[in-house]
């Protein structure tokens, strides 16, 4: 069984609850410059705001997995999410270059950071933190 987190942007009210949940769940140190992996906001001309996501789409043909020279990125056999082992990441950035949605970031220590779909939560029959806290339901965990 494979999953994905889907964003229904029209339902987003830009409350940033998902952003905060991602920071909390992943112990992201924004003061050091580390970035959350979840939805953020983009601003369009004339002050229009739209929801945008920097979260991994967990592509079925994930180029990031293929280009990683140390096997840092791999697909979880249970959830189907593209996950990583940051202890083997050398920070070369090859994965980020091929990501079609700019979902791969590098932490202040130079190692990879990306949405892993809250993989361990999903394995334990829980929703990803961003999905669980979303007050409008614009983020949903779906089977694919």
Q: What is the meaning of each model-derived region?
A:
Residues 1-144:
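Non-ligating segments of multi-cofactor redox enzymes
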């Amino acid at each position: 069984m494979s999953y994905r987190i889907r964003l229904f942007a029209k339902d987003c009210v830009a409350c940033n609850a998902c952003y905060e949940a991602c920071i909390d769940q992943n112990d992201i140190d924004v003061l050091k410059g580390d970035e959350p992996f979840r939805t953020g906001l983009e601003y369009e001309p004339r002050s229009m705001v739209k929801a945008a996501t920097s979260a991994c789409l967990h592509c079925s043909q994930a180029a990031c997995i293929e280009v990683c020279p140390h096997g840092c990125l791999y697909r979880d056999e249970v959830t189907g999410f593209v996950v990583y082992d940051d202890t083997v990441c050398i920070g070369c950035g090859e994965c980020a270059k091929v990501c079609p949605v700019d979902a791969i970031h590098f932490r202040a220590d130079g190692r990879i950071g990306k949405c892993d779909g809250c993989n361990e939560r999903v394995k334990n029959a829980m929703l990803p933190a961003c999905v669980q806290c979303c007050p409008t339901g614009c983020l949903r965990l779906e089977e694919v």
